[in-house]
UniProtKB/Swiss-Prot annotation:
GO terms for molecular function: neuropeptide hormone activity. It is found in: Secreted. This is Cholecystokinin. It comes from the Eukaryota. The lineage of its organism: Eukaryota, Metazoa, Chordata, Craniata, Vertebrata. The gene is CCK. Binds to CCK-A receptors in the pancreas and CCK-B receptors in the brain. InterPro entries: CCK-like (IPR015499), Gastrin/CCK (IPR001651), Gastrin/cholecystokinin_CS (IPR013152). One of its GO terms (biological process) is eating behavior. The keyword Glycoprotein applies. Keywords: Amidation, Cleavage on pair of basic residues, Glycoprotein, Hormone, Proteoglycan, Secreted, Signal, Sulfation.
Length: 115
């Protein structure tokens, strides 16, 4: 759930960044103005090209993150299975609950569970 929300926020930020890029105004053709503005336009194109490359790299990272998020087990049951795999000598794993602690519980040797 958190990864889905963070993914949506990331996509919104990328979309907002794309929409806020400056667009050069259309001006009447003038030989003096064209020469003076050619250098800044070239620089702007180079910056846009670099920005596009970084967006492509960010898109590749985002695609890799989505693939890993889909492959990773999620939910309460996967966490419980991981906890049970950590300590195989734990006798009462089927009676434990996530986030619950009983400080007054007797040890497994002293207490016999009804079958």
């Amino acid at each position: 759930m958190n990864s889905g929300v963070s993914l949506c926020v990331l996509m919104a930020v990328l979309a907002a960044g794309a929409l806020t890029q400056p667009v050069p105004p259309a001006e009447p053709a003038g030989s003096g103005l064209q020469r003076a503005e050619e250098a800044p336009r070239r620089q702007l194109r180079a910056v846009q090209r670099t920005d596009g490359e970084s967006r492509a790299h960010l898109g590749a990272l985002l695609a890799r993150y989505i693939q890993q998020a889909r492959k990773a087990p999620s939910g309460r049951m996967s966490i419980i299975k991981n906890l049970q795999n950590l300590d195989p000598s734990h006798r009462i794993s089927d009676r434990d609950y996530m986030g619950w602690m009983d400080f007054g519980r007797r040890s497994a040797e002293e207490y016999e569970y009804p079958s």
